[in-house]
Regions:
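ATP/NTP-dependent adenylation/nucleotidyl-transfer catalytic domains that generate, transfer
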Residues: 1-75
Length: 75
């Protein structure tokens, strides 16, 4: 539920391709590589962190590789 809410927040803020991975209470955000800079704009980044913490995550990170299909299937 927390992941779905986090992804919905990102979509509401203009990110059409998103993935939030939950590692316990830590959230890892994946957006396309070309959108990472947008995600890290200071105002948006602060709002993202505040929102994700309010959803129950204790930390938030951004995957600097970007959103890559099949990433978890790598050997």
């Amino acid at each position: 539920q927390r992941v779905g809410q986090a992804e919905a927040w990102l979509i509401q803020h203009g990110f059409d391709q998103v993935r939030v991975r939950s590692h316990g209470l830590a959230a890892r955000v994946e957006v396309p590589e070309e959108r990472i800079a947008n995600l890290l704009q200071p105002l948006l980044r602060r709002e993202l962190v505040k929102t994700f913490l309010s959803l129950g995550f204790t930390s938030v990170s951004v995957d600097v590789e970007g959103l890559v299909s099949g990433k978890l299937n790598r050997v």
